[in-house]
């Protein structure tokens, strides 16, 4: 369910970012059109819930609560990401909160869902959740570096796309924080 949800977000993200490439291949909206990508993403979201509902009924309420919180967090993070493109006041802390929501919450939610399915203790699920947040932050920070300094053949998309799209990345927010008026 989490993987299907994640891929749904990528379909919609590619439209919002006008990214033509995903994993080295044409993005769905590029190969077909925006409508196909939106409807495919919507169907994937519904299918993710269908998969989730196949889990043990004893833990299903907890799973649904965690899945919904995860989905809302990811959507909030995506909205921040879009909003930041037209803002000049994005700080490193705001950027870190955006990637915590957009990327960290997804990984954290996946780990917590696994813990719930395994009937782990709540404190264990919370430790896994916090670990997922930190892995997500590290992943997104590394992704920012790859977008600037990576190899397009390895990265699976053109280098510099975030810069061209006006994305507020860690590199940009840090540069703006340390720059002075003369720079």
Residue spans for each PLM region:
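Mg2+-dependent prenyl diphosphate-binding active-site environment of isoprenoid biosynthetic enzymes
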Residues: 1-181
